[in-house]
Structures are given as structure tokens and as C-alpha cells.
Amino acid sequence: MCSSINEGPYNSPTFGKSLSLKVDGGFNAVSINPSGRDIVLASRQGLYIIDLDDPFTPPRWLHHITPWQVADVQWSPHPAKPYWIVSTSNQKAIIWNLAKSSSNAIEFVLHGHSRAITDINFNPQHPDVLATCSVDTYVHAWDMRSPHRPFYSTSSWRSAASQVKWNYKDPNVLASSHGNDIFVWDLRKGSTPLCSLKGHVSSVNSIDFNRFKYSEIMSSSNDGTVKFWDYSKSTTESKRTVTTNFPIWRGRYLPFGEGYCIMPMVGGNNAVYLINLCDDDDSEQNKKTKLQPIYAFKGHSDRVIDFLWRSRHTCDGDYDDREFQLVTWSKDCDLKLWPISDSIYGKVNFDRGKRLEEKLPDYDYCSYNKEPENRENVQKNEFRRLRENFVTTSGLKKNKTNHITWLSGIRMNSATSQEDLFNETKIQNLGEEVSAIGHKFPKVVFEKISVSTRELCLTLNGPWSEENPDDYIFLRISINFPLNYPNKGDPPKFTIEENSNLTMSKRQEILSNLATIGQKYTDSNLYCLEPCIRFVLGEKVSLEDIEEGQEPLLNFDIADHIDFEELSSLDSSYSDSQNPENLSSQSDIESYKEALVFPDTSNQGLDFGRNLALDTTPVPNGCGSCWTATGELFCFFANEKKPEKKQNAIIKLSQKEAGVEKHPFKIEPQVLYDKEVDSSVITAADELKARPKRYVDTLGLGGGTNGDSRTYFDDETSSDDSFDSVADDWDDILRNDIIVRTKIPILRGNFKAFSSVHSESGKTVESTKKNKNLVISKNFSSLLSDRKELALEYLFMDATPEGFARNNALVAEKFDLDEISHCWQILSDMLIDQSDYDPYTTIWNNHPMGIKWFIKEAIVYFERQQNLQMLAMLCCVILSARRKKIPARYYGQELENMEGTIVFNDNESQNTSFWKGSDAFSTRSRSSTVTPNFYGNHLRGKNIHGGDNSSIRSDDHHARLRTHNTLNGSSKFTEPAQKQGSRAISSSPFHSRMPDIKVELLHDDIIEAYEQEDLLHLEVSDIPKFQTYIYQYSKLLFRWGLPLERVKILKVSTDFRSSYSSQGIPPNNNKKSPYNGVLTHWIENNEFGEEKFLARNCNYCDLRVTRSSFICGNCQHVLHSSCARIWWEIGDECPSGCGCNCPEMFDA
């Protein structure tokens, strides 16, 4: 049913020690086995069961994939049901049975709430009873012997329930928090509360009953107070109030002594505070005090989600010998165990060794981390009717947690260690050593990792063939580590599996050398697994360095034995902790200088798995620059300041030519810069030419690197000083860049540090590192024609065209831009509102020197000036002027109930006078069907026959039209075929007593002016170019941080589509916009006269959205649900380009 490695809690290797576990996976709730052996973490992916006595074993994963975050999880506290765990899943509660297989571990599903469950609590006295509370304001009590419905329900009716807790002394009493209030309920009194406690001014986040006094309860709230109540004495005032400077997320009584623990929701240094509850003066009611913690558990880098207590004691003892350990789970994904010292016990008045009134409960000290061997139900209910399984479990994922990755997140330290666990970078245990080795040697396969039993089994390939030394053979090695490893006299024991390719003599040779290496390292209290693996891989290991007190540095040339493609690195957090910049003391820095060790492979062939002569990776940039959208230029350089005193020689470590070397770990410094050589013959070009051109050369690994190459400098030549300093900085940068670039970690437990070269001035590279780079910022915005301040005040919407131009002229004048201001002033004069369809205005607009000419010349001029802002604004203003002047006939609108429609009637007494000195035709308002072009003809005719004697008239002006219609009323007019320079008006009655009359006006200047009027002011062929200007300007606005102005100008640019249609050029609807703008168009009626369905396209894939979709509540842009999942993984702004952060504004 459960596994047990250690005999009891007092053999636990982690109790009383500091432990840190890195567990990624978005876990939001945590609980602990009552025996203190296991921890359960709950998330949307299911449950993780972690064995605290064997944290190096990967967790057991119970899959349960849901979209809802787990609000709470709790392990059954009863010895009768130690395998039960309850967790939330939205409005349901799930009972898990760990004694079953992970694929069939769900025992019950409790469904009685209509909203999400917020808290769960087992009854401390009845193992089958638990309580749940929910956002639906209800509190339910459940009996697992009848789990179909709750046996008790109550509600506050006003506020959602956030917490529910049972009384430790009375199994019929429970309390729940609703908003700012706490209600105490008695199951025997129905849904009427026993009492209500009101005193908080903000939401209550946590409540807890006193373990020893049945009527006392504590509450913690967002108002930053902790209140202690005794509802047997008073329900209106709290017994005591403790104020803090942060909102409190959880607060509970200690399971020992007289005290309590609280943890903040935000702030509070992400710590858990322990406070003494003992108060000599308990008579004073509602006593207010400030927070005075006796101890603070600090170490997390993010908010603490919850804290638990782990305990152990002897079985059937008459004395209280309990020991405790604090367990915390934080949002930084760290599970930490904190030992409790005897001094803390004394501060909370916990008397260990006191005689017990009743014996403590006895729990089976076993772990549920492993899958059960058999699937037999613990309750032996084999006689239940078998249920059909409609869903198979064959497709369930297996527990594929990477063991090496899991080990890399575990760090454990002794409680008596002088080092801080959470700041220490040294190897502390076998698990950390195995994790580091697994990351460094990805070709070494660990078949078995059991840190608890201290057994390893690994496989690798080594050059141990007697027939051909260059051939690699397969080896399987088993390693047993003593309990006190790596103390002196406790070397590991190696066993090599027999292999047909491995002779007995070679096998004995390998075992003998491994035993020698292990003995030498453990005699110096050093971990020996890495040098042993290196030896089996074929590398020569020197033991003399250990005798001389020099600890070998981890070989950076890991590529000697594995391919570059398979090179792995530790997690970023681990790599950061190993960075030489993080050296904590001056002694560490000095040790770098004294014991800088690189393997000298001058005796070995440079075999890196590929030809390094083809590696052209460049060295890091020494300088560079970039422009900003506001016209600022940022430049960075290596610091060229000449040091006060040059060092005599700068040492660079490199590998020599192939050869035989006795000690491969010895240092062989090489002088690159020498003062004694005359530098007068060395030029600056030679200086630069001698620098490395490839990154591999900077590491001293290139096969073509000449070990005798030198670069010289002259202190007396001022022109060479900058090159000297650059050379110094360059060498230091490359040397310190080794760790960052290769990301190969350093095991500080075995090896000394690596630092900069000592200088005669007494300064190290680290001491002057802040001056290594120089960043210069220069503002050249005055040289640019585009101005952000103009964009903030320019107008191009919600006004008349002349108003736009006049405002923009004043804005340009405000910033002393006279040329731009004059252009806007001229344009505003040309756009002044004129009487509609005045013949003089029409002719002037088409004049060769009119507005169209001016706009064309202005655009050409500003194109030469490269003034993108002015080009885009001119296009927007001209387009707004066109929209104002364009008549209805260009939009194809029907005109209904038009006044001025010509009416024909055959009644002489009712004849309409057409031209008898009156100013216009006598008209009658009548509804008639008119084609769009007729309206233009009618307006033209109205001007032609006007009585203005001063107007220009042709001979055709005096032609009288008379037509009689036999029908009483209505006539339908159609426009005949048109020819250039002529117009015809005709009437075609069905039964006319008079012959048809047709009047043509030929070569009329005024009519031609109207007919040929160009209302666009722009060349149609140039419209795509102008649209490009607007689009590029919108991108510039976005880079300036003006998303609203960007959206406005993009909206204006979409009106260019109507410009195409008005000129008789149909837009290409099949062509996608190259600018990803939001294009709008009118929905036309279909052949049945019904409007088409208003469908919207996805802003990601541009396909129609018909089913599940994501609609932003702020910008109203639409995405398919599947497209939204893809986009929000790679982007943080709306895919339409509007600049909205849609996930945050979803329900705006």
C-alpha cells in the first residue's frame, strides 16, 4: 500500500535539516501527510506526491488536467484514512485514494456547490466528515459514507465564503468567513449561526480554532490585523488585536506551545512570522498591540502561498517529545524545510518532556510516493458491482519527470552548518553531485539513481579496447556510496559489468584506478564522481594536484569528449549562482588568482567532434550604435581609459600543440604583451590585426592559433595608449566571458574560483568592471523633419478641412517651423468653404494653377525633404476635403422625396412655366424613381435656367421644354447614352399625344466644367503611394508611444478604398491589404433583398469567425480561440496592431 525506506521518523535524513526543492508546474496548494513523510502539491495538471525522506526520487504524478486552478488541497489527518486527499476542481471536490493506481485514484466526487469552492477542511475527530465552502455563499458538510449530497448546509446569503474550519474540541461546531465577518455554526442548531463575529474592515482571509480552548478563534484579514475572539465571553469585541503593516493571507495557531504564525499577502519580505501569544494581562478586553515577532523565516524571493508543520514523536510515549519542522511553499516554486531550534521552543513556552494527559496518535510512517504494487482496494469492497469503463487509460501520460532535472532543484544542508543553504553555492550532498554530473555529461546515461540507498548505475563508452585503443566500448558501471561519503576513509565502491569486448585485465585496471582516485579524493573530503567519470571516458586525471593542495578546476573544454550539439547546461538560476561575479568574499577572489587551473592538452590531439578551423563564430562586439524613434543615437564602446600603471604582462591561457604531458591540469601561462620589446616598429594596424577574429581563438582552442604570437605596445606613445587599453579590456572581457558563453557550471565544492589577473595597481578586473563599457547618448532630433510634438497637436479628424489646415498652421508656427506653417496657411485659404456648385468655383478648382497643382507641388517638395509627417498629414486633409465636397451620385445613393423634380402634365391650366423670367422652374414635390445621374442633371439644369442675368449663357439656355403626359402623375426618367461633351434629357411616356422632344446641349463650357470636375485633388495612380506614406507614419506614431493617434490615422487611410470606386476603378477585394490595416466596407444587399450576415474575420489568420472566438472588451478585435492560444504565447499586444493588451482588457 505504501513504501517505507527508513524504519521510522527518527531515521529521516531530512528532518532537522534545511531543504530546498525547486518544483515547477504552477502549483497553487500544498498539504502534508499527518505522519510528516509526504507532501502533496496540487495544480491544474494534477497532484505531485513528494517523499520528504527521499526528495531525490522524482514525485508521483496523479494526472487530472483541468482549466481551473486548485484553490485548496488537504491530506486526511486521521490514522484510519492516511491515504485520502481532497482537492478542489471549480465547484467540485475530489477525494483521491493514494492506495490505488494513479490512473484510478479518484474515490469520490462531491458536487453540491454552484460556484467555485474556496476552502476544504477535514473534521479532526471524524475521518469520514469534511466541510466545504464556496463563492455561492454556502457551507456544506459531507459524510463520505453517503457522498451523494451534503448532510448539512448553511449560508450567510450575502457574501461569498472564503474559509471554513472545524472546532478541534467540539466536532459539531465549525466556523466560516464571509466578507468581513466570521460566522460560527452548530450542526445541531440548523442553519442559524451560533454567533457572528464582526470587527474587521476588510475581507477575512484566514480563520483557525485554538487547539486547546474550544471557544477561542483567530482571524486574519486584508486590513492588516489579527483578531483573537472568545465567543463564549463576547461576540461584539475581540479579545486582542494585533496590527501589521501588510495584509495577512494566512494566520494559524502553533501546534505547540503558546504562539501563532502569520504570513503576508504582499510585502512583509516574503517571510513567515512566528509570534508569542502569551500575555500576562488577559483581563483587558480588545487590547491592541503591534506585531512583535520572535522569529522570521526569510528566504523566499516571492510571495509565500502556504505554510505547514511537520512533526515527529515516539510511539506510545507518556511524555511530550515532539519535534517540529516548518514547511513553506512559495510562488517562486521553492518548497523549503526550516529546522526549529530549541531556543524557539522556549520562546513560545513549549515544554518538551512534559507528561501527556493522553497519548499522541500513532501514524504509519510510510510514503505514497510509489505506485502501489497491487490495485486491490483497501476497503476490500470487491463485491461491488463493476462499473464499465467507457474511457480507456492506455493513453494516459506516464510519469516522465526528468530525474536529472529534478535533482538539480534539490539542495539540502545540515541544521548545524555554518553556511546559509539558500546562499551557499557548494555541493552539499550526493544528489547535487549527481545532478551536476548529469548536466555536464549528457552522453553518460544514468539507468538508476537512488540517492536514498546511495546507489547509482550508469552507462557510457570509453576507449578501453586492447586491440584498437581508438575504439570505444560500452561499459555499465554500478556505484555504491557509503553513508558518510565523502568523508575520509569512505570511498565509493565500483562494479563493472562483464563485457565480451572488455578483457579481464582492462576491467581490473579500470577498477584499480577508480579505487585509487576515489581514495585520494575522499581522503581530502572531496567528491570524486566527476574525476572518476572523466577517467573512464579516457581523460588523464592527475592526483598530484590534490597532494599539493590545488583542487582541479572543472575542465571548460568539455567539448573534448562530447559533440557541440549535445552540450547541455544547467538551469539559468544555477548558472547565475556559479558566475564569478557572484564571489562573496575577497578570499574567493584571491583564490582565483592563486589557483587558476586549465587543462593543458598539449599531449593530446585536439579532437572536438568537428573541425574547429571551420568555426567562424565572431568575437563579441567592442562597439556599436543604434537609432531611436525620437532621433537619439546610442553608442557603446569598450572603455579606452589608460590605467594608472600598466601591468607587466597579461596572461592568457591557451592550449599548446599536440604532445605528451605528464600533468594535464598544470597551468602554462603564455605572455602576449611584453614591454621589453621595442614597439616603435609596431603600428596600430598591426595591433588590430593581431587580435583574435574568431571566438574559438579567444578560448585558446583553435588549431591554427600560434602559441608564440605576440602583440606589443609602447607606454611612451600617446597615440597607442587607446590601443593598449583596448587590448587590456579586450583580453579581460574575453577571459570573463568564457563562463557566460559556454554556460558550463563550476562546482565550487571541489574547485577553487577563477578570477581576473592580478595587476600592479592593486586593482582587479572585478573592481573596475563597472567602467568596462561606455554608453553615449546624443540627441539629433533637430536634424529630423518629423516631430513628435507636432503629432501631439496636429488635427486631421472631427473638423472642416480648412479648420484642419488652419490649426496645423498655428501648431507649426508655435514651434518656429515657418515653411510648414506657410504651406498649411495656403492650403487653408484654398479649402475655404464655398457655395455649392458655383460655376466660378468649379472652373477655378480645375484651373492649372489651382489647388490640385499646389498639392502636387507640395508633395513633390516634401518628398525631396523626406518629411514623412507632412506627406501623411497632407494626404489625410485632402482626403477629408474630398469627402466633404463629393455629391451623392458618387456614392450611388437613391434620392427619395426630392424637391425640384420636373413634373409634366397634359392639363394646360396646370402647365408648369419653364422660362418666363422666373428664377427657377415651378416645381412640385412628388415622389418618383430617379436614377443617380438624374440628380446631377437636375442640379445642372437648375443653374442653366436660372434667372440670373449676369450669368454666362449659351444659345441653348433659352430652349423651352414642353411635354405632356397622358398619365396623371408620375413619370419615370432615364438618362440616355452619354457622349463626351453632350447631354440629353428625354421623356418617354407610355401614351403621349405629343411627339417626343429631345434637347441636346453641345460643347457648353459650364456643363463641361461640372462634368469634368475632379474632386479627388490627387492622381489615382499615386493613391497607393500616399497610402504607404500614411501607413509608415502610423508606424512612426507607434514607436513614439502614440497608439491613439496611430489608430486615428489608420482609420482615415481606409477611406482611400472609396476613392477607387468613385473613379470607376473597382477595388480588388481578393487582394489582402499589405499593411494589415483594418479595412471597412458597406455590406450590400443580396439578390433577395436581405442583408448579408455580418461576419468578422480573425485578426490573426484573416478567416471568417463563425464559432468559438475571443473578442477583446477594449478594442473589439476578434480572434479564433485556437488562434488566440497561438498568438498570446508569442505576443503581448493585439495582432491587429492597435496596441491593446487584450488579455488584461478582456472584460473591460
From Swiss-Prot:
WD repeats, residue ranges: 63-106, 112-152, 156-195, 199-239, 299-348
A Pfam match: zf-RING_16
Membrane topology: Peripheral membrane protein
A GO term from the CC aspect: fungal-type vacuole membrane
Skewed-composition ranges (Polar residues): 964-990
Keywords, sorted A to Z: Membrane, Phosphoprotein, Protein transport, Repeat, Transport, Vacuole, WD repeat
Occurrences of domain RWD (ranges): 432-543
Protein localization: Vacuole membrane
Residue numbers spanned by region Disordered: 963-990
PTM annotation (Phosphoserine): residues: 759
Gene Ontology biological process terms from the UniProt entry: cellular response to amino acid starvation; positive regulation of TORC1 signaling; protein transport; regulation of TORC1 signaling
An MF annotation (GO) of this entry: signaling adaptor activity
Transmembrane segments annotated in the record for this chain: none
Entries under InterPro entries matching the protein: RWD_dom, WD40/YVTN_repeat-like_dom_sf, WD40_repeat_CS, WD40_repeat_dom_sf, WD40_rpt, WDR59-like, WDR59_RTC1-like_RING_Znf
Subunit field text: Component of the SEA complex composed of at least IML1/SEA1, RTC1/SEA2, MTC5/SEA3, NPR2, NPR3, SEA4, SEC13 and SEH1.
Similarity remark: Belongs to the WD repeat WDR59 family.
Described function: Component of the SEA complex which coats the vacuolar membrane and is involved in intracellular trafficking, autophagy, response to nitrogen starvation, and amino acid biogenesis. May be involved in telomere capping.
Additional detail: Present with 556 molecules/cell in log phase SD medium.
Name recorded for this polypeptide: Maintenance of telomere capping protein 5
Protein source organism: Saccharomyces cerevisiae (strain ATCC 204508 / S288c)
